Amino acid sequence: IYTVAKMIPDLSSIPEVDGQLMAGDVLAELVHHPDRTTEEVIEEYLKDRRSDIPDKRVQEIIVQMRFIDSYATSFFREQAVRILVENGIRVTAYGTGWDQCEWSGSPYLDYRGKVLAPEILPSMNDAKIVLNTMTWFKAGAHDRIFNGMLAKAVVVTDDSTYLRREFTDGRELVMFRRQELGTLPERVFDLFGHLERAQEIADCGYAAARDGHTWKSRAEYLNCLLYTSPSPRD
């Protein structure tokens, strides 16, 4: 949250409504109903207040307000780490802003500062558990998930429709819903208390990522779409 503030545009460029008030209301709605998309909530907000705004202008405003995605993501990311730390689970965190959290002095937070993206993969190789919180899309996956699996760690992540379709909670990875963040410490403690089971999840996750979720497998999938699917002109 502390680094996202730099992304806020000039909200006075949205004369149709009070941009600052809209940003706060939309963010509050996303925090309370995290299954909703930013686009959906902004459109609903605008239509409720100004039914005369053309669809094209609604789309432009949605683009201007994209920073709300990052705020919502940052909120849940901080809450996920915080609830683990406050329950006595040691978390190693990388990136900016963690030292500005009011709870950053906890002995259970091992903050190692900002690192370049290529340095994260070797760190994953040393981890037993990789915690992921996704950006605000609802039907996809972040590459951290597959990188964590390929590092042979147990991946603990918030869910999406895609992840629920591709994997089974407790088999290839551990999934939680943002609305049930309070259960996260219990899920992690369960992994600590059943190390053989945790290793089975890590092994299944590695096999699943190796067999179907590498860059090579993605390239083959795209190649299949491009060269074997019927042409739109046919």
Label for each model-derived stretch:
Residues 1-138, 142, 160-163:
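Nucleotide-sugar donor-binding catalytic core of glycosyltransferases
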Residues 96, 103-226:
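Catalytic binding pocket for nucleotide-activated donors in carbohydrate/polymer assembly enzymes
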Residues 227-234:
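Conserved small/polar residues in nucleotide/adenosyl-binding loops
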